[in-house]
């Protein structure tokens, strides 16, 4: 006899990560091309001496380091009680859904956005309210209009994954002011370190001035710790404490905690690396536009190509050229900004592909 499982799981999509193909250029997972700093590597190596022991379940040293770091980014002071640590920001997002939404409740986010939002809401038994983007960007006015008495959580992915766009800081602040205070607003800032051109929101200030705001960040992208899985949330203690209650014990390993602390201590050196990525982002975007592609203005470490019905062909032909990119149904393709020589290979392929496509019409 087959075990009785939750019916909701039958229609739940399985998360498909970016492909890794031996010998191919991988531009599918928004990973940094930079390896760990020597100081971070040394911290990880030192932590291996005690991996026979469980990690600190409270991540106390990590929280203290992050509280100091976040305080340095804002005029406000933060303590460890304002910080939750999790197995990547994606796990913290799932925890946020767990503490806010259940059967009959609604969670609002723009779409298309991070593809794990819908299944996380579905698993909780809640309803995902997907508000269409406008010009590849979150439509904050439409999201406000979607609020009902059943709304429990609103997620703003900023910069948005996969479209790479950002909402203006003033618009985000006004949006937060307009959301009813009993509804939690989560600002997912996985790519915040790549923001430039005056687009960096003062999200720590929003946390301190609005009790219903929580910010999610990760060490997987700019800090280069994707393989260790550690992220954090910044919020008011009455939000952080419930997050810790639904944290799966010991999921942030000793190695991840040591690497996170060392990375925060070397934040200036690590974040200086993002300048090279931003420069390449500008070059790749400009050359793709010159070749005839539509490329929304990116504020992340990737670009978005809204190819619609041409998506499958682009992805298939790119794979034949030993380049792996990330397709999103019939919407488009996300392409990671990588090392200059890898970006050059992508540009050569893209020019060839669009010339062939245009010539075939």
From Swiss-Prot:
In-chain residues carrying the UniProt-annotated modification N6-(pyridoxal phosphate)lysine: 221
Keywords, ordered alphabetically: Aminotransferase, Pyridoxal phosphate, Transferase
Cofactor(s) essential for the protein: pyridoxal 5'-phosphate
InterPro entries listed in its UniProt record: Aminotrans_II_pyridoxalP_BS, Aminotransferase_I/II_large, ArAT, HisP_aminotrans, HistidinolP_aminotransfase, PyrdxlP-dep_Trfase, PyrdxlP-dep_Trfase_major, PyrdxlP-dep_Trfase_small
The EC number(s) this enzyme carries: 2.6.1.57
UniProt-recorded name of the protein: Aromatic amino acid aminotransferase
Reactions the enzyme catalyzes: an aromatic L-alpha-amino acid + 2-oxoglutarate = an aromatic oxo-acid + L-glutamate
GO terms, molecular function: aromatic-amino-acid transaminase activity; histidinol-phosphate transaminase activity; pyridoxal phosphate binding
Reported function: Aminotransferase that catalyzes the conversion of aromatic amino acids and 2-oxoglutarate into corresponding aromatic oxo acids and L-glutamate.
